[in-house]
């Protein structure tokens, strides 16, 4: 679906890969996008001025600048991403007086930030309450947002995988020896990556598995130091690469593995399912909307033995679970193709504009 002339003002972190993908696809489908950001990312954007020493004040003090931009560019839609940050900023700027506001939830803005303090909770709630529509990638996430504030309307739209990358889906489901496991989550406390190494170190040291992690994350140095001491060269680290190259790289693995302590519906897991990997993840609510023990493996958070037993089963039984993997890919094709997900977003934008005009 194309939307010629639809003018969208996106407020988001310009450093984020999710922002890059989102803005690029809106433009590909015919939207004119004006991206404003407090961060200084590589993509083309308008840089909002950061004022004050405290990051939380940056949003407050940028409100006047955003008001000026709204009057100048006259967008059809204002689309903040991350309710507790840019959603709050859009609310302070009175964006709703200029155009309908669609706020995209990113997960931690709802599941983590509000618990930091009363201030964080209230600013998140304010951002939500001043939105015409709130969009999240799981029912769990949207419900959590509704528990924080009265929301005018909401939708669930996943972050899917691009159509072209579905062609990288594995043709051969045979499990490799050693079993190749990829953990494509950055090294942050919430992703609990070192737990995975501790749990699976005996299997790695016996040469039964190979574990691959990204280079990215603020705890990367700490992770490497401790992980190397446990499994040596069975630990593989990959650097950031172009998306198409990474999709091909991920498709070469047998298993997708996550130990996230908090999450909505993980985009990386959906991508892995579309590519034909077997998913294994810690049993948390957002994950359950895509993963159960009928199409992959869930294990109790922090339970090393439970995770180790799942991986041992895969190695010993040598059961590639072909039916699961085909069914997972079909669901992704049906519900989580990125181009279709963005087309749905654009339709919602048109609906809001029409509703305001009527």
Predicted segment positions?
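A charged, aromatic-enriched C-terminal amphipathic alpha-helix characteristic of glycosyltransferases
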Residues: 319-353
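Conserved acidic donor-binding segment of nucleotide-sugar-dependent glycosyltransferases
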Residues: 293, 297-304, 313-319
């Amino acid at each position: 679906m194309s939307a010629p002339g639809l003018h969208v003002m996106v407020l988001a972190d310009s450093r984020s890969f999710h922002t890059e993908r989102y803005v690029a696809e809106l433009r590909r489908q015919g939207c004119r996008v004006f991206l404003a950001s407090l961060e200084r990312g590589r993509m083309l954007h308008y840089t909002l001025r950061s004022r004050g020493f405290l990051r939380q004040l940056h949003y407050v003090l940028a409100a006047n600048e955003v008001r000026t931009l709204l009057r100048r560019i006259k967008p059809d839609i204002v689309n903040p991403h991350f309710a507790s940050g840019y959603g709050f900023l859009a609310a302070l700027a009175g964006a709703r007086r200029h155009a309908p506001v669609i706020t995209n939830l990113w997960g931690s803005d709802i599941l983590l930030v509000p618990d930091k303090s009363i201030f964080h909770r209230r600013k998140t709630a304010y951002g939500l309450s001043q939105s015409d529509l709130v969009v999240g990638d799981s029912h769990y996430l949207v419900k959590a947002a509704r528990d924080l504030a009265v929301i005018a309307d909401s939708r669930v739209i996943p972050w899917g995988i691009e159509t072209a990358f579905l062609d990288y889906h594995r043709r051969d489901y045979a499990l490799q020896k050693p079993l190749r496991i990829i953990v494509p989550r950055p090294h942050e406390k919430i992703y609990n990556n070192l737990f995975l190494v501790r749990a699976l170190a005996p299997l790695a040291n016996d040469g039964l598995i190979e574990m691959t992690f990204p280079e990215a994350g603020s705890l990367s140095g700490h992770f490497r130091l401790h992980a190397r001491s446990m499994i040596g060269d069975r630990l593989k680290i990959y650097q950031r690469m172009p998306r198409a190259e990474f999709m091909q790289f991920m498709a070469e693995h047998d298993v997708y593995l996550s130990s996230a302590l908090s999450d909505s519906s993980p985009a990386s897991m959906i991508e892995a399912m579309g590519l034909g990997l077997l998913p294994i993840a810690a049993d948390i609510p957002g994950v359950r909307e895509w993963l159960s023990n009928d199409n992959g493996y869930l294990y109790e958070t922090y339970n090393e033995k439970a995770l180790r037993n799942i991986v041992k089963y895969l190695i010993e039984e040598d059961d590639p679970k072909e039916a699961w993997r085909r069914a997972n890919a079909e669901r992704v094709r049906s519900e989580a193709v990125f181009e279709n997900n963005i087309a749905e977003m654009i339709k919602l934008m048109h609906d809001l504009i029409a509703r305001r005009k009527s």
